[in-house]
Regions:
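Acidic-aromatic substrate-binding/catalytic surfaces of carbohydrate-active enzymes
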Residues: 2-37, 57-61, 65-127
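Extended, loop-rich substrate-binding clefts of extracytoplasmic carbohydrate-active enzymes
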Residues: 24-52, 57-61, 109-167
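Carbohydrate-recognition beta-sandwich/jelly-roll modules
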Residues: 67, 80-81, 92, 144, ...
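Asparagine-centered strand-capping/turn motif at beta-strand->loop junctions
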Residues: 173-176
């Protein structure tokens, strides 16, 4: 199993600038959430023009599958490819085109995203911290994590790829 960092270019519709002042509860109730996002900045606009944007990706690969993780976009699994059947096994969106449906604005479809403390977390379109572990059994784990600012919880997702296995193991860890 190998892991590496690589710059990738993905056509992207850029988001607008965040509101300069914090937005407190203003009846922005969304799918059962309170609507509160403070202290996160809210973005309420996006570009209609597509540009090629460079992202720092982390790849993990074995003889069966290849996975791309995007730390700059919330640590989501953007792409997972079955090398034997020669097809993606999760929805792979080749363009980053946010919709303003997330708690703090931008949210993108495709891949696998992780949400804590609630769905479409406010930071789903923000960078997260990462660490890569090479395990004794030859497997590799990529950890993505953040200290969530609303409730001060640390959330982590670990993606492990093992030699000789055709699946991605995912482990979630929450500290509160």
């Amino acid at each position: 199993v190998k892991a590496w960092k690589e710059k990738v270019v993905i056509p992207t519709y850029e988001v607008g600038k965040p509101e300069k002042n914090p937005i407190f509860l203003e009846k922005r109730v969304y799918q059962g959430s309170s609507g509160v996002v403070y202290p996160y900045p809210v973005i309420e606009s996006m570009s209609d023009e597509k540009v090629d944007k460079e992202y720092d990706a982390i790849f993990i690969e074995n003889e069966y599958i290849k996975v791309m993780i995007l730390p700059e976009l919330g640590g989501r699994v953007q792409m997972a490819y079955d090398k034997i059947k020669q097809r993606h096994f999760i929805y792979y969106n080749h363009v980053i085109k946010p919709a303003l449906v997330g708690l703090a604005g931008p949210w993108i479809s495709g891949g696998i995203e992780f949400n804590w403390p609630q769905h479409h977390r406010p930071s789903t379109y923000m960078p997260v911290d990462t660490a890569v572990e090479e395990n004794a059994d030859g497997s590799v784990t990529v950890w993505v994590n953040e200290m969530e600012r609303m409730f001060h919880q640390k959330g982590m997702a670990g993606f492990t790829l093992r030699p000789g296995h055709a699946f991605l193991e995912i482990k979630g860890v929450l500290y509160y």
